[in-house]
C-alpha cells in the first residue's frame, strides 16, 4: 500500500489534522465560516501592510506625504492602501459576526478557546488603533492624543504612564515611531495566538447549532467545509473589492485628509466605526476613571460570559426568551455604535447612558436570570 505523505510527514501531518482530515460536525451552518474568513483577512492585512511599510516613512514631517506618495507614485499603491484600510473594516465585521455566533450557539463554553479569542480581539483593537495614527492626519493625531490621555485617569501613575507612552510631553515623533513599530509587530503576535486559538479548538472539536455532542455524526473538513469556506472567500473578496474600488473612503473620516495640526482641534473627535460602541460607553460615564474602566470592561465582559451561563442547554436555538435578549444585545450594540459617532449633546447623552446600562445589564443580570428562569419553565432543574 502506498504511503500517504500528508499523514506521515512531520509538518504536513499537523496541517492534515487541522485542515484536511479534521472531523467536523455535519450540521455546522454558514456562521461557522467566519473563523476561516478571519484567517484570510489576517493574511490580506499582513501582506498589504508589508508592501505599505516598504514605502511608508514613520516621521511626523514625512508620514502624511509618504502616504500621498504611495497613492500617487507607487505602482498600484492606491489599491494596496485602499485594500488595507477597508480590509480592517471587513476584519472587524467578521470578528463581530464570529463573536455573535459564539454567543448565540454557546461556543463560549470552550473556555480556553473563548478567552484566547477575547485576547485576540483586544490585540486586534490595539493594532487597529496604532495603525490609524500612522497616516498622521488630523483624526490620527487627535485620536491618538485623546485615547492615550485616558491613561492619565489611573491614580498616581497616570501622568507618568501617558508620558512614557508618548515618549515626551505630547504626541510627537517618538509616538509615531513606536506606534509604527507596534503596528508592524502586533499582527504577528495575533498570528501566533490564532494558532493557539485553533490548537485549543481542535482539542475539543467544533460546536454545532444544536449545542449537543456531535461525535456520532462527523464528516471530514476537506472537501465538504474547505469548499464551503472557499465560496465564503469569494463572497468576502467581492465585497472587499467593491468597497476598495468603488467606495474606498465610505468608512473613513474626511478629517484625516488634513495633515495633523496640534493647534487646530477637529469639531468632533471620533475613532473608526468599529470602536464607536466602546467609545459611546466611555463617553456615557461622567467620571474619567469610571469611563476608562467601563471601556475596558465592555470588551473583557466577554470573559465572564462562560461563568454566567446558567442554562442547562448550550445553544439558544431552543430558548426563545434568550434568543430575544440576544437580538436586544445586537440592537443595543448598533445603537451604541450610532451614539458614538454623534456629538456630546442631548438627546444623545441620555440615549448613550441608557444603552450603556442596557449593555452591561444584559450580560451580567438579564440573560443569566432569563436562562435560569427557562430551566424552571422547562423543568430542567
From Swiss-Prot:
Q: Which GO terms describe its biological process?
A: mitochondrial electron transport, ubiquinol to cytochrome c
Q: Which GO terms describe its cellular component?
A: mitochondrial inner membrane; respiratory chain complex III
InterPro entries linked: Cyt_b/b6_C, Cyt_b/b6_C_sf, Cyt_b/b6_N, Cytb/b6-like_sf, Cytochrome_b, Cytochrome_b_C_euk/bac, Cytochrome_b_N_euk/bac, Di-haem_cyt_TM
Cite the binding residues for a ubiquinone: 202
Q: Which residues cross the membrane?
A: 34-54, 78-99, 114-134, 179-199, 227-247, 289-309, 321-341, 348-368
Which amino acid positions bind heme b b562, per UniProt? 84, 183
User: What does the record note about the cofactor?
Assistant: Binds 2 heme b groups non-covalently.
| Cofactor(s) needed for function | heme b
Any keyword Transport?
yes
Classify the protein's membrane topology as the record does. Answer: Multi-pass membrane protein
Indicate which residues the UniProt annotation says bind heme b b566. 98, 197
Gene Ontology MF terms = metal ion binding; ubiquinol-cytochrome-c reductase activity
Kindly list the places in or outside the cell where this protein is found, as annotated in its UniProt entry.
Mitochondrion inner membrane
Q: Which UniProt keywords apply?
A: Electron transport, Heme, Iron, Membrane, Metal-binding, Mitochondrion, Mitochondrion inner membrane, Respiratory chain, Transmembrane, Transmembrane helix, Transport, Ubiquinone
User: Could you tell me which Pfam families the record lists for this protein?
Assistant: Cytochrom_B_C, Cytochrome_B
Q: What interactions and quaternary structure are annotated? A: The cytochrome bc1 complex contains 3 respiratory subunits (MT-CYB, CYC1 and UQCRFS1), 2 core proteins (UQCRC1 and UQCRC2) and probably 6 low-molecular weight proteins.
Family listed: Belongs to the cytochrome b family.
Functional note = Component of the ubiquinol-cytochrome c reductase complex (complex III or cytochrome b-c1 complex) that is part of the mitochondrial respiratory chain. The b-c1 complex mediates electron transfer from ubiquinol to cytochrome c. Contributes to the generation of a proton gradient across the mitochondrial membrane that is then used for ATP synthesis.
Q: What else is on record for this protein?
A: Heme 1 (or BL or b562) is low-potential and absorbs at about 562 nm, and heme 2 (or BH or b566) is high-potential and absorbs at about 566 nm.
Please give the name of this protein.
Cytochrome b
Amino acid at each position: 500500500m502506498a504511503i500517504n505523505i500528508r499523514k506521515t510527514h512531520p509538518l504536513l501531518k499537523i496541517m492534515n489534522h487541522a485542515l484536511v482530515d479534521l472531523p467536523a460536525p455535519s450540521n455546522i451552518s454558514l456562521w461557522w465560516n467566519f473563523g476561516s474568513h478571519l484567517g484570510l483577512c489576517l493574511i490580506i492585512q499582513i501582506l498589504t501592510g508589508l508592501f505599505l511599510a516598504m514605502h511608508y516613512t514613520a516621521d511626523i514631517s514625512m508620514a502624511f506625504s509618504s502616504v500621498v506618495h504611495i497613492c500617487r507614485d507607487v505602482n498600484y499603491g492606491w489599491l494596496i492602501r485602499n485594500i488595507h484600510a477597508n480590509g480592517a473594516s471587513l476584519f472587524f465585521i467578521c470578528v463581530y459576526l464570529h463573536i455573535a455566533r459564539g454567543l448565540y450557539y454557546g461556543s463560549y463554553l470552550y473556555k480556553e478557546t473563548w478567552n484566547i479569542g477575547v485576547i485576540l480581539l483586544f490585540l486586534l483593537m490595539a493594532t487597529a488603533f496604532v495603525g490609524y495614527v500612522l497616516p498622521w492626519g488630523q483624526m490620527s493625531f487627535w485620536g491618538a492624543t485623546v485615547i492615550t490621555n485616558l491613561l492619565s485617569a489611573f491614580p498616581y501613575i497616570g501622568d507618568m504612564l501617558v508620558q512614557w507612552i508618548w515618549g515626551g510631553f505630547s504626541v510627537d515623533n517618538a509616538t509615531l515611531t513606536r506606534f509604527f513599530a507596534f503596528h508592524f509587530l502586533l499582527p504577528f503576535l495575533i498570528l501566533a495566538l490564532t494558532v493557539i486559538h485553533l490548537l485549543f479548538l481542535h482539542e475539543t472539536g467544533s460546536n454545532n447549532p444544536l449545542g449537543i455532542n456531535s461525535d456520532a455524526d462527523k464528516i471530514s473538513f476537506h472537501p465538504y467545509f474547505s469548499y464551503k469556506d472557499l465560496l465564503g472567500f469569494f463572497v468576502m473578496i467581492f465585497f472587499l473589492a467593491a468597497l476598495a474600488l468603488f467606495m474606498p473612503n465610505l468608512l473613513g473620516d474626511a478629517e484625516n485628509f488634513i495633515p495633523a495640526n496640534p493647534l487646530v482641534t477637529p469639531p468632533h473627535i471620533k475613532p473608526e466605526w468599529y470602536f464607536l460602541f466602546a467609545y459611546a460607553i466611555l463617553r456615557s460615564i461622567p467620571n474619567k476613571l469610571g469611563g476608562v474602566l467601563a471601556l475596558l470592561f465592555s470588551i473583557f465582559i466577554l470573559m465572564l460570559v462562560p461563568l454566567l451561563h446558567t442554562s442547562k442547554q448550550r445553544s439558544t436555538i431552543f430558548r426563545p426568551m434568550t434568543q430575544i435578549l440576544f437580538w436586544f444585545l445586537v440592537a443595543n450594540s448598533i445603537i451604541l455604535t450610532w451614539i458614538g459617532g454623534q456629538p456630546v449633546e442631548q438627546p444623545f447623552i441620555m440615549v448613550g447612558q441608557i444603552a450603556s446600562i442596557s449593555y452591561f445589564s444584559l450580560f451580567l443580570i438579564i440573560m443569566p436570570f432569563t436562562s435560569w428562569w427557562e430551566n424552571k419553565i422547562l423543568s430542567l432543574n
